[in-house]
Amino acid sequence: MATIIEMPELVLEKVIAFLDFKAVLTLRQVCHDFRNFIDDLNDSKLPDSKFQEIKFVSDDRRISFGLEESKKRFTCISYSKGQRSFCGKTEFFGYSNILNVAVRDMEMILKFQKTILERLQFEFHNVQLYGGSLVHTVPIKLSNMLQKLNRNVKTRTLSIKTNDPSPIMQILRFVDPGALKTIELSSLDGKMEIEIDEFAKTEQWKKADGIHCGFNVLNLNLEDICHFSSCSITLNSITAQELDFLRKTPQKTSDFSFFCVVLSLLHGLKNDFWTVDRYGKC
């Protein structure tokens, strides 16, 4: 008697098309034949997971995914000590390859995502993972995976929290600029300073509607932020000419619904803040 895996490929494709994301992942773990068949399927033949938000965190010697389908439906997958926990089940993989398991799962999750995400969030904490994998290798592996995915991730908001600027470009360049509306960049300890001139050259930056930077920005060319309808930037210093430019910019740009540049002047424990509102008033 023929086994289910010996059924015609067209029949198996129809079966998988009727399953949801979790059911296909479960089927993928049944045997090597199912895993290979599902992994080789064209993305268009996989069901849409329809996630609203995907959150990837490397923190406290572990990696975790937060998958939000709706406000009332939330799934968490965690990886630590060489094991993966998902839907009440734990699998053991060994310390040496748990990072590879997590990245491979992230690739599978993104393959299932057909609709545009509301938010894609990454947090890269300064920790060392089990098996000797340093935290800076996590965004590198993610970047390699996104390149292998061979299509940009569609999300309206991209949020990256890190104390190392390198993951920002490694992730940003693989986000679909046509879908991206808001870029949120922040430091986990509030102390990071970063040069953003390279980010400003990307299509993602140029086509986004809003930018919010929760760290001190260096080498800022004010012309690179004039197209944003919502902008929050922290600077260490600013010239009188630049303040005058900011004052006039909202008046010149018709779609400038809100614009805010924060200037933090540190004098001991004292902070002074300047803002430019949508009416060009400083």
What residue spans do the PLM features occupy?
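Non-core capping and flanking segments associated with repeat-based/extracellular domains
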Residues: 1-282
